[in-house]
Amino acid sequence: MSSGIILLIVAIVLLVIIAYLVGVIIRKRNDSLITSLEERKQALFALPVNDEIEEVKSLHLIGQSQTSFREWNQKWVDLTVNSFADIENHIFEAENLNDTFNFIRAKHEINSVESQLNLVEEDIASIREALNILKEQEEKNSARVTHALDLYEKLQASISENEDNFGSTMPEIDKQMKNIETEFSQFVALNSSGDPVEASEVLDRAEEHTIALGQITEQIPAIVAKLEDDFPDQLDDLETGYRRLLEENYHFPEKNIEARFQEIRESIRANSSELVTLDLDRAREENTHIQERIDSLYEVFEREIAAYKVAAKNSKMLPRYLAHVKHNNEQLKDEIARLSRKYILSETESLTVKAFEKDIKEIEDSTLAVAEQFGLQEKPFSELQVTFERSIKTLTNVESGQMDVFAAVKDIEKIESQARHNLDVYVTQLHMIKRYMEKRHLPGIPQDFLSAFFTTSSQLEALMDELSRGRINIEAVSRLSEVATVAIANLEDLTYQVVQNATLTEQLLQYSNRYRSFEAGVQSSFEHALRLFEVENDYQASFDEISYALETVEPGVTDRFVNSYEKTREHIRF
């Protein structure tokens, strides 16, 4: 053979070997793909879809939910019966084609199987999701129904246990319960007939009505208890107490108490009858009005009971107090009469005592007999309390006024005695002041002193005249005595001032001799001051003139003389 042929043969052999090797590699790769597809198929087939279907089926779906479930269940059946079988056939065909090295057709079958598995996988996911939605929805609906039924059953049990607490409302409550029961039956019928929307609305209404009725039944017993127990008990208590108070001679300003009892009982009956409408707000409001009317009756009785205690106490005190005040007034009248024989008294005291007597007489005429016959009175104790308290207040004011009048007249004799004593003292002081001035040997007496002296003397004479009368005007005596006291004190001060000015002026005039010869101002003031001193007897002006002149030449000299005089000044010996 030629070398060319040999090379050709070798090349062909190499090509065959290479082709074989390539075929083996492709076959193994396809086997791997086919195995992977088989595993995917088995994994999909092994999903717990059947279990999930059985779980949803056990929920006993109805209506639209049941229809939807059947559709998804049928889709699963189609997948298991048709799709999986078709995939199995295509996998088997791909294996045969791959084993016979028909790689192109094998690849086509592999691609076809892969596409089918993708579709099946999506369908299974949709089926499982739909089943889960159906399950959740059914569980939710079931929970709603269960919750609503539980509410209804609890309400029914509560009403049965407390039937006696609902009074006249029981027929209406039974009617409402039957209406709710009818709504539940309507819900079941609509749900079974495949109308879930309407069924849901009916269930909502049933639940709302159950809750509303439950809230109403919680409030009714308290209202009924008021109408059937509390109010009747309170009325019985009031009527019993009213009869007992009447037996104990109580009387009341209100004359319609029996009628008010009857009106309240009628209101209780009317409210009980109206309560069947379950208008609880109106019933509570009416209960409040009834309680207010009952409370007002309690207040009437409690007022009279409290008034009795006060009036009974005051009825015992009033006669004694009246006698005491009357006795005081008689004593006061006697004292004023005694004093009036010697003294001219203010008309105020007499008029006041007469006013006291009038007040006492009015109480004696209008209230004393009522107090003394307290147990036989046919008036409300509250009125008697007001009457007694008003009378006691009047007597208190009278007694206080009596004390004021007594305080005003009790010291009249002391006032006279003190005035006489003061007069004697003041007359003596007036004489001593006169002698004190005479002993000073002054050039003359200043006019202001003379005016004060004679005015004081006149005031003492006026007081003496008043005390000499047959009936002394004690007010005038008191006034004149006060005026005399002030006048004698002022005269004493003026006396000391006149004597001091005169003495100091004499001393300063003598002292000024030191400066007169060489101080023209001092000489001039000396002459002026001397004229004021000896001629005009104006000792104050004379002192001011000479002291001013000396201060200009010897500051402080005046104070030195004044201080020295005050230490040695002679006092009036009273």
From Swiss-Prot:
Q: What is this protein called?
A: Septation ring formation regulator EzrA
Residue ranges that the UniProt entry lists as topological domain Extracellular: 1-7
Q: Which residues form a coiled coil?
A: 102-141, 274-350, 459-520
Tell where it localizes: Cell membrane
Lineage: superkingdom: Bacteria
Q: How does it sit in the membrane?
A: Single-pass membrane protein
NCBIfam families, per database record:
PRK04778.1-1, PRK04778.1-4
Q: Which Pfam families match?
A: EzrA
Q: Tell me the residue ranges located in the Cytoplasmic compartment per UniProt.
A: 27-574
Q: What does this protein do?
A: Negative regulator of FtsZ ring formation; modulates the frequency and position of FtsZ ring formation. Inhibits FtsZ ring formation at polar sites. Interacts either with FtsZ or with one of its binding partners to promote depolymerization.
